[in-house]
Protein backbone atom coordinates (compact mmCIF):
# COMPACT_ATOMS: atom_id res chain seq x y z
CA UNK A 1 0.00 0.00 0.00
CA UNK A 2 1.59 3.23 -1.19
CA UNK A 3 -0.68 5.58 0.73
CA UNK A 4 -0.44 6.90 4.27
CA UNK A 5 -3.05 8.96 6.10
CA UNK A 6 -2.09 11.67 8.57
CA UNK A 7 -5.21 12.40 10.61
CA UNK A 8 -5.43 15.43 12.87
CA UNK A 9 -7.64 16.79 15.56
CA UNK A 10 -7.61 20.58 15.10
CA UNK A 11 -7.96 22.59 18.31
CA UNK A 12 -4.80 22.39 20.44
CA UNK A 13 -3.31 19.95 17.95
CA UNK A 14 -2.62 22.17 14.94
CA UNK A 15 -3.68 25.36 16.71
CA UNK A 16 -2.85 26.51 20.27
CA UNK A 17 -6.44 27.34 21.32
CA UNK A 18 -10.02 26.38 20.58
CA UNK A 19 -10.92 28.01 17.27
CA UNK A 20 -13.73 30.12 18.76
CA UNK A 21 -11.34 31.76 21.23
CA UNK A 22 -9.32 33.79 18.74
CA UNK A 23 -12.11 36.14 17.68
CA UNK A 24 -15.64 34.73 17.87
CA UNK A 25 -15.98 34.61 21.66
CA UNK A 26 -14.72 38.20 22.19
CA UNK A 27 -16.98 39.36 19.34
CA UNK A 28 -20.12 38.25 21.21
CA UNK A 29 -19.16 40.11 24.38
CA UNK A 30 -17.13 37.69 26.47
CA UNK A 31 -13.97 39.03 28.08
CA UNK A 32 -12.81 35.56 29.08
CA UNK A 33 -13.11 32.42 26.97
CA UNK A 34 -13.65 30.28 30.06
CA UNK A 35 -16.88 32.18 30.77
CA UNK A 36 -18.23 31.17 27.37
CA UNK A 37 -17.31 27.52 27.89
CA UNK A 38 -18.87 27.60 31.36
CA UNK A 39 -22.12 28.84 29.84
CA UNK A 40 -21.94 25.98 27.35
CA UNK A 41 -21.33 23.45 30.12
CA UNK A 42 -24.15 24.87 32.24
CA UNK A 43 -26.49 24.76 29.26
CA UNK A 44 -25.60 21.12 28.60
CA UNK A 45 -26.20 20.18 32.22
CA UNK A 46 -29.48 22.09 32.41
CA UNK A 47 -30.86 20.51 29.24
CA UNK A 48 -29.13 17.13 29.66
CA UNK A 49 -27.64 17.46 26.20
CA UNK A 50 -24.43 16.59 24.39
CA UNK A 51 -21.66 19.09 25.08
CA UNK A 52 -20.95 19.65 21.39
CA UNK A 53 -24.60 20.36 20.65
CA UNK A 54 -24.62 22.74 23.59
CA UNK A 55 -21.76 24.90 22.35
CA UNK A 56 -23.34 25.04 18.89
CA UNK A 57 -26.63 26.10 20.48
CA UNK A 58 -24.98 28.81 22.58
CA UNK A 59 -23.10 30.17 19.55
CA UNK A 60 -26.36 30.35 17.64
CA UNK A 61 -28.16 32.08 20.51
CA UNK A 62 -25.42 34.59 21.29
CA UNK A 63 -24.59 35.73 17.76
CA UNK A 64 -27.18 38.09 16.23
CA UNK A 65 -26.59 36.92 12.65
CA UNK A 66 -24.68 33.65 12.44
CA UNK A 67 -24.12 32.71 8.80
CA UNK A 68 -21.89 30.39 6.83
CA UNK A 69 -19.82 33.36 5.69
CA UNK A 70 -19.47 34.75 9.22
CA UNK A 71 -18.07 31.42 10.41
CA UNK A 72 -15.72 31.09 7.45
CA UNK A 73 -14.39 34.58 8.15
CA UNK A 74 -13.56 33.42 11.69
CA UNK A 75 -11.02 31.06 10.17
CA UNK A 76 -8.84 34.00 9.20
CA UNK A 77 -8.21 34.74 12.88
CA UNK A 78 -7.11 31.21 13.78
CA UNK A 79 -3.42 30.96 14.63
CA UNK A 80 -1.41 27.81 14.03
CA UNK A 81 1.43 26.12 15.84
CA UNK A 82 4.95 26.76 14.64
CA UNK A 83 5.70 25.18 11.28
CA UNK A 84 2.16 24.08 10.44
CA UNK A 85 1.91 26.44 7.46
CA UNK A 86 4.77 24.64 5.64
CA UNK A 87 4.32 21.19 7.21
CA UNK A 88 2.14 19.69 4.50
CA UNK A 89 4.40 20.66 1.61
CA UNK A 90 7.46 19.27 3.37
CA UNK A 91 5.85 15.98 4.37
CA UNK A 92 4.21 15.47 0.98
CA UNK A 93 7.54 16.01 -0.76
CA UNK A 94 9.31 13.56 1.55
CA UNK A 95 6.61 10.95 1.03
CA UNK A 96 6.83 11.33 -2.74
CA UNK A 97 10.59 10.84 -2.56
CA UNK A 98 10.00 7.54 -0.74
CA UNK A 99 7.27 6.45 -3.15
CA UNK A 100 4.49 7.14 -0.63
CA UNK A 101 1.43 9.30 -1.28
CA UNK A 102 0.57 11.25 1.88
CA UNK A 103 -3.05 12.24 2.48
CA UNK A 104 -4.12 14.62 5.24
CA UNK A 105 -7.46 14.55 7.07
CA UNK A 106 -9.14 16.50 9.87
CA UNK A 107 -11.46 14.88 12.42
CA UNK A 108 -12.49 17.67 14.78
CA UNK A 109 -15.19 18.57 17.28
CA UNK A 110 -14.75 22.15 16.11
CA UNK A 111 -16.66 23.81 13.27
CA UNK A 112 -16.08 22.79 9.68
CA UNK A 113 -16.90 26.25 8.37
CA UNK A 114 -14.21 27.88 10.53
CA UNK A 115 -11.62 25.28 9.52
CA UNK A 116 -12.52 25.89 5.87
CA UNK A 117 -11.68 29.55 6.42
CA UNK A 118 -8.15 28.91 7.69
CA UNK A 119 -5.01 29.28 5.62
CA UNK A 120 -4.44 25.51 5.53
CA UNK A 121 -7.96 24.43 4.51
CA UNK A 122 -6.90 23.25 1.05
CA UNK A 123 -4.27 20.88 2.45
CA UNK A 124 -6.83 18.30 3.55
CA UNK A 125 -8.42 15.60 1.43
CA UNK A 126 -11.42 15.70 3.76
CA UNK A 127 -12.48 17.74 6.78
CA UNK A 128 -14.80 15.97 9.21
CA UNK A 129 -16.15 18.40 11.79
CA UNK A 130 -19.34 19.88 13.22
CA UNK A 131 -21.53 21.95 10.94
CA UNK A 132 -24.83 23.80 10.85
CA UNK A 133 -27.81 23.53 8.53
CA UNK A 134 -28.53 26.82 6.75
CA UNK A 135 -31.59 28.47 5.26
CA UNK A 136 -31.69 29.85 1.71
CA UNK A 137 -30.00 33.07 2.85
CA UNK A 138 -27.12 31.21 4.47
CA UNK A 139 -28.27 31.74 8.05
CA UNK A 140 -27.42 28.97 10.51
CA UNK A 141 -30.66 27.47 11.79
CA UNK A 142 -29.81 24.13 13.43
CA UNK A 143 -26.86 21.77 13.96
CA UNK A 144 -26.59 19.51 10.91
CA UNK A 145 -23.73 17.33 12.08
CA UNK A 146 -21.78 16.91 15.30
CA UNK A 147 -18.48 15.14 15.88
CA UNK A 148 -17.96 14.25 19.53
CA UNK A 149 -15.13 12.16 20.94
CA UNK A 150 -16.77 8.78 20.27
CA UNK A 151 -18.25 9.71 16.89
CA UNK A 152 -14.74 10.59 15.72
CA UNK A 153 -14.00 6.87 15.33
CA UNK A 154 -16.59 6.52 12.55
CA UNK A 155 -14.48 8.69 10.30
CA UNK A 156 -11.40 6.55 10.83
CA UNK A 157 -13.32 3.67 9.29
CA UNK A 158 -14.44 5.91 6.44
CA UNK A 159 -10.81 6.69 5.67
CA UNK A 160 -9.88 3.03 6.09
CA UNK A 161 -12.48 1.96 3.52
CA UNK A 162 -12.29 5.01 1.28
CA UNK A 163 -15.96 5.82 1.91
CA UNK A 164 -15.38 9.52 2.47
CA UNK A 165 -18.92 10.78 1.80
CA UNK A 166 -20.64 11.23 5.18
CA UNK A 167 -24.01 10.41 3.62
CA UNK A 168 -22.89 7.01 2.36
CA UNK A 169 -23.54 4.67 5.26
CA UNK A 170 -24.29 1.62 3.10
CA UNK A 171 -20.74 1.17 1.79
CA UNK A 172 -19.29 2.08 5.17
CA UNK A 173 -21.13 -0.78 6.87
CA UNK A 174 -20.67 -3.27 4.05
CA UNK A 175 -18.04 -5.97 4.56
CA UNK A 176 -14.84 -5.07 2.73
CA UNK A 177 -11.92 -7.51 2.21
CA UNK A 178 -8.66 -6.29 3.73
CA UNK A 179 -6.93 -6.17 0.36
CA UNK A 180 -9.59 -3.74 -0.88
CA UNK A 181 -9.25 -1.28 2.01
CA UNK A 182 -8.31 2.21 0.83
CA UNK A 183 -5.78 2.89 3.60
CA UNK A 184 -5.06 0.20 6.22
CA UNK A 185 -4.93 1.29 9.84
CA UNK A 186 -1.26 0.31 9.89
CA UNK A 187 -0.67 3.21 7.48
CA UNK A 188 -2.42 5.79 9.66
CA UNK A 189 -0.98 8.37 12.04
CA UNK A 190 -3.46 10.06 14.39
CA UNK A 191 -2.51 13.37 16.04
CA UNK A 192 -4.43 14.53 19.12
CA UNK A 193 -3.95 16.51 22.30
CA UNK A 194 -6.11 15.09 25.06
CA UNK A 195 -8.60 12.69 26.57
CA UNK A 196 -11.23 13.42 23.91
CA UNK A 197 -8.88 11.78 21.39
CA UNK A 198 -8.52 8.53 23.35
CA UNK A 199 -11.19 6.50 21.48
CA UNK A 200 -9.64 7.41 18.11
CA UNK A 201 -6.14 6.75 19.40
CA UNK A 202 -7.18 3.32 20.64
CA UNK A 203 -8.79 2.37 17.32
CA UNK A 204 -5.72 3.38 15.32
CA UNK A 205 -3.12 1.97 17.71
CA UNK A 206 -4.96 -1.30 18.36
CA UNK A 207 -5.12 -1.89 14.63
CA UNK A 208 -1.41 -1.40 14.02
CA UNK A 209 -1.24 2.33 13.35
CA UNK A 210 0.59 5.16 15.10
CA UNK A 211 -0.71 7.81 17.49
CA UNK A 212 0.90 11.10 18.48
CA UNK A 213 -0.09 13.02 21.61
CA UNK A 214 1.01 16.61 21.07
CA UNK A 215 1.54 19.20 23.78
CA UNK A 216 2.48 22.85 24.05
CA UNK A 217 4.86 24.32 26.60
CA UNK A 218 2.26 24.27 29.38
CA UNK A 219 3.22 21.88 32.16
CA UNK A 220 -0.27 20.41 32.52
CA UNK A 221 -0.54 19.65 28.82
CA UNK A 222 2.88 18.04 28.83
CA UNK A 223 1.87 15.79 31.71
CA UNK A 224 -1.32 14.74 29.91
CA UNK A 225 0.55 13.77 26.75
CA UNK A 226 3.02 11.72 28.78
CA UNK A 227 0.12 10.04 30.58
CA UNK A 228 -1.41 9.05 27.24
CA UNK A 229 1.90 7.53 26.23
CA UNK A 230 2.31 5.75 29.57
CA UNK A 231 -1.19 4.30 29.26
CA UNK A 232 -0.28 3.09 25.75
CA UNK A 233 -2.91 5.25 24.07
CA UNK A 234 -0.20 7.28 22.33
CA UNK A 235 2.79 5.81 20.52
CA UNK A 236 4.63 9.12 20.83
CA UNK A 237 4.29 12.24 23.02
CA UNK A 238 5.79 15.22 21.18
CA UNK A 239 5.85 18.99 21.43
CA UNK A 240 3.48 20.73 18.99
CA UNK A 241 6.28 22.10 16.85
CA UNK A 242 5.85 21.21 13.18
CA UNK A 243 8.84 23.14 11.89
CA UNK A 244 11.67 21.73 9.79
CA UNK A 245 13.78 19.13 11.64
CA UNK A 246 11.43 19.12 14.65
CA UNK A 247 10.82 15.89 16.54
CA UNK A 248 7.38 15.56 14.96
CA UNK A 249 8.84 15.90 11.47
CA UNK A 250 11.59 13.37 12.17
CA UNK A 251 9.07 10.96 13.69
CA UNK A 252 6.65 11.14 10.76
CA UNK A 253 9.49 10.79 8.27
CA UNK A 254 10.56 7.68 10.18
CA UNK A 255 7.04 6.26 9.88
CA UNK A 256 7.03 6.99 6.15
CA UNK A 257 10.39 5.21 5.86
CA UNK A 258 8.95 2.20 7.69
CA UNK A 259 5.92 2.00 5.40
CA UNK A 260 8.13 2.34 2.32
CA UNK A 261 10.44 -0.44 3.58
CA UNK A 262 7.47 -2.71 4.25
CA UNK A 263 6.21 -2.07 0.73
CA UNK A 264 9.57 -3.08 -0.71
CA UNK A 265 9.61 -6.28 1.36
CA UNK A 266 6.09 -7.18 0.20
CA UNK A 267 7.34 -7.30 -3.38
CA UNK A 268 9.56 -10.28 -2.51
CA UNK A 269 6.68 -12.42 -1.23
Region locations from a protein language model:
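Alpha-helical substrate-recognition element adjacent to the catalytic core
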Residues: 1-136, 228, 234-235
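C-terminal cap/substrate-recognition subdomain and adjoining C-terminal extension
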Residues: 75, 82-105, 109-269
Amino acid sequence: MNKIALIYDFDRTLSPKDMQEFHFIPSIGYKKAEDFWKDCADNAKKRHMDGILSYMMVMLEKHPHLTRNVLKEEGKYVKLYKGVDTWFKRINAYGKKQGIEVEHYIISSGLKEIIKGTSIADEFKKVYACSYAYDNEGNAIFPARIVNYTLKTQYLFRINKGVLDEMNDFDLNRSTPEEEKYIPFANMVYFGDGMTDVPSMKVVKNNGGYTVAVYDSAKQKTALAMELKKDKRATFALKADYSKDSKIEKTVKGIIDSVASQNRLEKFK
